[in-house]
């Protein structure tokens, strides 16, 4: 199985602009990417970062084994086109024209991803397995059908269900809190601090920036220490 991790190498995570500077967003995005790559390798696979611009894995905080297992492919096309170019076609996996090698697509902002969560996705038996995100997006999927293609515009999870039906592919929805939580908005940062582990890079980066959990009216939010705020 090929595992592709799309990554916006320039100007990442713009929806976090209200709480992070451009440099901080870049550092945080790369920390999340490093955590995702680590989880993929721990799940027994070799990830390919599908980056919008050149990216040196040496610049990421990665263990040597993870760095050596990974690779980078540069494709500056929109996400849908770039991913579709990586999906299997009939005959990709064998000479008889029938077998194909499945392709998994795992987004780089799944900061809570673990090897166990990924293994549950990778082991799904359907032609197409999808982990929906909040708001009907698609956070991760595995494609084992030569005619299925992605469409990441709008409510992509609903679109992917329809596309699978149209091409005659079986589909399984994989219910996963860890893979279903993508980090896009300031409110999402609380999930990183609550559920991240001590060895994860993303929560460590947020703490370096001065973020901490704050309890107000029975709810947990994040707050940034005043002295750590950019001037």
From Swiss-Prot:
Metabolic or biological pathway: Cofactor biosynthesis; coenzyme F420 biosynthesis
Keywords: GTP-binding, Nucleotide-binding, Nucleotidyltransferase, Transferase
Single biological process term from Gene Ontology: F420-0 metabolic process
Cysteine disulfide links: none
Reaction it catalyzes: (2S)-2-phospholactate + GTP + H(+) = (2S)-lactyl-2-diphospho-5'-guanosine + diphosphate
One of the record's GO molecular function terms: GTP binding
EC number of the protein: 2.7.7.68
Keyword match Hydrolase: no
UniProt keyword annotation of GTP-binding present: yes
Pfam families: CofC (PF01983)
Function (record text): Guanylyltransferase that catalyzes the activation of (2S)-2-phospholactate (2-PL) as (2S)-lactyl-2-diphospho-5'-guanosine, via the condensation of 2-PL with GTP. It is involved in the biosynthesis of coenzyme F420, a hydride carrier cofactor.
Subunit structure: Homodimer.
HAMAP family: CofC
Family membership: Belongs to the CofC family.
Protein name per Swiss-Prot or TrEMBL: 2-phospho-L-lactate guanylyltransferase
Species for this entry: Haloterrigena turkmenica (strain ATCC 51198 / DSM 5511 / JCM 9101 / NCIMB 13204 / VKM B-1734 / 4k) (Halococcus turkmenicus)
